[in-house]
Amino acid sequence: ILWSRGHAKGNEFTTEDGEPVNSWMPQIIIGAQYVEAAGVALGLKKRKKDAVAYAYTGDGGTSQGDFYEGVNFASAYKANAVFFVQNNGYAISTPRELQTAAPHLAAKGWGSGIPSLVVDGMDPLAMYLAAKEARAWAAAGNGPVLIETLTNRLEPHSTAGDDPLRYRTKEDIAEW
C-alpha cells in the first residue's frame, strides 16, 4: 500500500527486522502478474524449493494476453504455480458472458492443460482446502493449478463513481 501511495518504504519488501517477505512489486498491467509468477515458479522448480508462486486476477484479467502467456508457460514447464481467478461475474462493469464464451473461467486453465477447480469463494473452508491441495500438487513438481473462486462483489469496483446499479439488478445483489 505504501508503494502505491509513493512512499519510499513501499519499495522495501522485507519485514521490520529485515527478513524478506517473498513478494514482488505489484503489477499495474492487468494479467501481467501471471507471466511474472510463471517465471518465479519455474525458478522455484529448478532450485527444487518446497515453494510455489501465487498469482491473482479477476474476471477481466483472464481476457488479457499476459494471462494466457503466463498460464501456458507455467503449464509447458510444469512450474510450481497456483493461479487464482476471482469470478464475481463482472470485469469492472462487463458481465462475464460479454467478455468470454468459456462456461467457466477455469476452462481457460483446462485449455492449457492445467488442472483447474471451481470453488465457492464465499466459503472460507472450501477455499482453504482447495488452496492447500493446489499448493501440495504444485510444490510436488506436478505443475500449476488454477482455482476459480465464485464470489460476489460486495462494494463498487472502484471509488471513481462506479454505481453497480447501472449494470446489476437489485435482485442480483440481494441473491448473495
Model-predicted regions and their roles:
Residues 137-176:
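Glycine/aspartate-rich loop-and-adjacent alpha/beta segment that forms the canonical ThDP
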Residues 57-63, 85-91, 122-125, 151-153:
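Acidic, glycine-rich active-site loops and adjacent beta-strand->loop/helix elements
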Residues 51-55, 81, 141-147:
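Generic beta-sheet signal
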Residues 1-79, 95-101, 106, 111-113:
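Cofactor-binding active-site loop characterized by glycine-rich and histidine/acidic residues
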Residues 78, 83-86:
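Short internal beta-strands
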Residues 45-49, 102-133, 175-176:
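Conserved thiamine diphosphate
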Residues 67-70, 129-136:
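Glycine-rich, charged/polar anion/phosphate-binding loops
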Residues 90-94, 114-120, 163-174:
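Short beta-alpha connecting loops at secondary-structure transitions
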